[in-house]
């Protein structure tokens, strides 16, 4: 789960991480009032969406008086920002962060991520702050420094100091930088983050080390023990189809293709997408109905797939282990009738009660194309959608 920058900064502040003072605003008048309350000569007006690259897209403006705050708030609120992370459709700006300006001396990057290769949390840092870390990794990887953290003891002070020296934090500010990184690590662990990224971390003319931006992502599987974080969820920033899928315990991820996929099991779902690509098709989604799908779940899965206007055909690929093929067949028939399906539908069933499942489909009188194997099904649906 993602949260907004201003929410991330509030979380970090509770762990002793230094962040600029700021207030969230949902209207132009609230933005002006927030700037008045901050009482600083310079304010930064920042669009709040779940995506990076806001500055380049015109979503971050420096205001030197209240009139400029009003002008920038009017120009940003309600507009659609398109960045490299939003996709071409962009995201509508519905809230702003009004923040005090900083006398920036130098920008850095600091982040905590999970390294799956070593099964450890890794602290990464670079003195090339303010730019995409992926770009730094590609062009100048030698400028990225890493410290792998032993989960038994956590981030150690000497590791944070080594990072601070490696990225050339001024000596007089190393202590602050170490405190910053230790607080960031505590937040990462205690809040079950999957990413905690500060880009940029800055040193200021007043001799402070601060987080000028904050990106925190949380492990959705751990949200049951973080009710405070769950309350920060902004459904406006999430895909409506993903939200609907989560209500029925369906795992849905939208893609850019035109072949809808309904599969049970994440591994089979990925294999299904691979084989569709192999036969020169393009999957429109990843949709895992899980091991205990009911007729109701299958119907909802169909509705979610069909809500994507790019879908030109559907491939149902089910291996019946816990799930029985006859139950799936009945669900497919019920769903087809309910939604009035007119698109090509290819169904491949294998496993428990497979013959009964095929018999139910064959006797349904509906225009359902049966497939004998996954490869056969993929070829048929690719052919049908043209």
Swiss-Prot record:
Residues where substrate binds: 264, 321-323
ATP-grasp domain ranges (all copies): 9-244
Top-rank lineage group of the source organism: Bacteria
GO cellular component, as recorded: cytosol; succinate-CoA ligase complex
Pathways per UniProt: Carbohydrate metabolism; tricarboxylic acid cycle; succinate from succinyl-CoA (ligase route): step 1/1
Annotated binding of Mg(2+), by residue: 199, 213
Note on cofactor: Binds 1 Mg(2+) ion per subunit.
GO BP annotations listed: succinyl-CoA metabolic process; tricarboxylic acid cycle
Sorted UniProt keywords: ATP-binding, Ligase, Magnesium, Metal-binding, Nucleotide-binding, Tricarboxylic acid cycle
Cofactor: Mg(2+)
Enzyme Commission (EC) number: 6.2.1.5
GO MF annotation list: ATP binding; magnesium ion binding; succinate-CoA ligase (ADP-forming) activity; succinate-CoA ligase (GDP-forming) activity
Enzyme class label: ligase
Positions annotated to bind ATP: 46, 53-55, 99, 102, 107
Function: Succinyl-CoA synthetase functions in the citric acid cycle (TCA), coupling the hydrolysis of succinyl-CoA to the synthesis of either ATP or GTP and thus represents the only step of substrate-level phosphorylation in the TCA. The beta subunit provides nucleotide specificity of the enzyme and binds the substrate succinate, while the binding sites for coenzyme A and phosphate are found in the alpha subunit.
Subunit structure as annotated in this protein's UniProt entry: Heterotetramer of two alpha and two beta subunits.
Entry's family note: Belongs to the succinate/malate CoA ligase beta subunit family.
Record-linked PANTHER family: SUCCINATE--COA LIGASE [GDP-FORMING] SUBUNIT BETA, MITOCHONDRIAL, SUCCINYL-COA SYNTHETASE BETA CHAIN
Protein name in the entry: Succinate--CoA ligase [ADP-forming] subunit beta
């Amino acid at each position: 789960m993602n949260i907004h920058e201003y929410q991330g900064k509030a979380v970090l502040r509770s762990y002793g991480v230094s962040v600029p003072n700021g207030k969230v605003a949902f209207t132009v008048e609230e933005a002006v009032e927030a700037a008045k309350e901050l009482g600083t000569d310079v304010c930064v007006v920042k669009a709040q969406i779940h995506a990076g690259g806001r500055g380049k897209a015109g979503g971050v403006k420096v205001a030197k008086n209240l009139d400029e705050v009003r002008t920038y708030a009017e120009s940003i609120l309600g507009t659609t920002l398109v960045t490299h992370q939003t996709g071409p459709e962009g995201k509508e700006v519905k809230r702003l962060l009004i923040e005090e300006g900083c006398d920036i001396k130098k920008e850095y990057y600091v982040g905590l991520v999970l390294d799956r290769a070593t099964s450890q949390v890794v602290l990464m840092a670079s003195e090339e702050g303010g730019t995409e870390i992926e770009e730094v990794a590609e062009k100048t990887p030698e400028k990225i420094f890493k410290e792998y953290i032993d989960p038994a003891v956590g981030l150690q002070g000497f590791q944070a100091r080594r990072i601070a020296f490696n990225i050339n934090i001024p000596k007089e500010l190393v202590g602050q930088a170490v405190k910053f990184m230790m607080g960031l690590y505590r937040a990462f662990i205690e809040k079950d983050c999957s990413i905690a990224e500060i880009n940029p971390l800055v040193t200021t003319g007043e001799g402070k080390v601060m987080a000028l931006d904050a990106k925190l992502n949380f492990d959705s599987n751990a949200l049951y023990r973080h009710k405070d974080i769950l309350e920060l969820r902004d459904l406006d920033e999430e895909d409506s189809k993903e939200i609907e899928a989560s209500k029925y315990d369906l795992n849905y991820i939208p893609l850019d293709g035109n072949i809808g996929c309904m599969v049970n099991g994440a591994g089979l779902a990925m294999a299904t997408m691979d084989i569709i690509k192999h036969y020169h098709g393009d999957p429109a989604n990843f949709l895992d109905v899980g091991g205990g799908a009911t007729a109701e779940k299958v119907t909802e899965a169909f509705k979610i797939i069909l809500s994507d206007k790019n879908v030109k055909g559907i491939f149902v690929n089910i291996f019946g282990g816990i799930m029985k093929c006859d139950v799936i067949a009945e669900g497919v028939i019920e769903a087809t009738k309910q939604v009035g399906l007119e698109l090509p539908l290819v169904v491949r069933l294998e496993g428990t009660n497979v013959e009964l499942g095929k018999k139910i489909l064959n006797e349904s009188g509906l225009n359902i194309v049966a497939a004998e194997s996954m490869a056969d099904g993929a070829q048929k649906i690719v052919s049908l959608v043209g």
